[in-house]
Amino acid sequence: MGTVKCIGILTSGGDAPGMNAAIRAVTRAAIYNGLQVKGIYRGYKGLVTGEIKEFKSQNVSNIIQLGGTILKTARCKEFTTPEGRQLAYDNMKREGIDALVIIGGDGSLTGARIFAQEFDVPCIGLPGTIDNDLYGTDTTIGYDTALNTILDAVDKIRDTATSHERLFFVEVMGRDAGFLALNGAIASGAEAAIIPEFSTEVDQLEEFIKNGFRKSKNSSIVLVAESELTGGAMHYAERVKNEYPQYDVRVTILGHLQRGGSPTAHDRILASRLGAAAIDAIMEDQRNVMIGIEHDEIVYVPFSKAIKNDKPVKRDLVNVLKELSI
């Protein structure tokens, strides 16, 4: 196990349902293996400012069902500077922390990679993001819960869209990845998904919608990823309104609703497995890897691979949506 006797845990970047389940798993697995645990508040900001507290098993009782993160999360400009990272390292050493477990997305893992390279600190990452955009893992903590939140919202929007015979553009999160939009569309029976991985022109949408109305579909729902590459739901809605004023068009932006809520059973189990595996990795002297899951097996993915590679959307899912929305 080397010289690791105390680990620090932090959550960074956008919050995701299941982060608390991961905090619980890391804490209890560490204690089970004889390690001391320190909770670092507000992500890398807490490492810079010294907001650090010892965690016992009872500190993580009754949190597995909670959304958000008890450790809080924040952006930290100071950590992007060498001076800020030096402060973070000094605080880490003062607290006796030998290794870090970072729960977050690609920005969080990028920060961990830089920190590890500069100070030779063992860092283990857990994929915590609703976007599901990290390479090397089939799914990320929070993605399943966000997908179910989208499904619940679209089911309700479908009721009013049908009643008023309207075309709804529903914008979902995902940044530059279309996993939420595409799989949300398949799960909800939406007519189309606009995602950054594949271009969609207004005339393609219009022909698709026309076909639906010819087949007695009196309403349609299109899910749009929030990416700058797509322009978002408002962009498409305005273009359709201008070019095809015969359609009654509405826009719903789900926004931060997707980040909240109690995590699903899938996310709780995933977070628990990944959290326990993070401690296994530390005990094995692993460093600077993300813990992922592929084909239901735990994998160690180097930070460089997880961060630099784009996670592809499966073309067969695009085809499934196209075939089922006729």
From Swiss-Prot:
Its EC number is 2.7.1.11. Gene3D superfamilies: 3.40.50.450, Phosphofructokinase domain. The active site is at residue 131. ATP binds at residues 14, 75-76, 105-108. It catalyses: beta-D-fructose 6-phosphate + ATP = beta-D-fructose 1,6-bisphosphate + ADP + H(+). SUPFAM superfamilies: Phosphofructokinase. One of its GO terms (cellular component) is 6-phosphofructokinase complex. Its cofactor is Mg(2+). Substrate binds at residues 129-131, 166, 173-175, 226, 250, 256-259. Mg(2+) binds at residue 106. Pfam families: PFK (PF00365). ADP binds at residues 24-28, 158, 189-191, 215, 217-219. Its main location: cytoplasm. Keywords: Allosteric enzyme, ATP-binding, Cytoplasm, Glycolysis, Kinase, Magnesium, Metal-binding, Nucleotide-binding, Transferase. InterPro entries: ATP_PFK (IPR022953), ATP_PFK_prok-type (IPR012003), PFKA_ATP_prok (IPR012828), Phosphofructokinase_CS (IPR015912), Phosphofructokinase_dom (IPR000023), PKF_sf (IPR035966). Pathway: Carbohydrate degradation; glycolysis; D-glyceraldehyde 3-phosphate and glycerone phosphate from D-glucose: step 3/4. One of its GO terms (molecular function) is 6-phosphofructokinase activity. The keyword Magnesium applies. It is found in: Cytoplasm. It comes from the Bacteria. Allosterically activated by ADP and other diphosphonucleosides, and allosterically inhibited by phosphoenolpyruvate. Catalyzes the phosphorylation of D-fructose 6-phosphate to fructose 1,6-bisphosphate by ATP, the first committing step of glycolysis. Homotetramer. Belongs to the phosphofructokinase type A (PFKA) family. ATP-dependent PFK group I subfamily. Prokaryotic clade 'B1' sub-subfamily. This is ATP-dependent 6-phosphofructokinase 2. It comes from Bacteroides thetaiotaomicron (strain ATCC 29148 / DSM 2079 / JCM 5827 / CCUG 10774 / NCTC 10582 / VPI-5482 / E50). The gene is pfkA2.
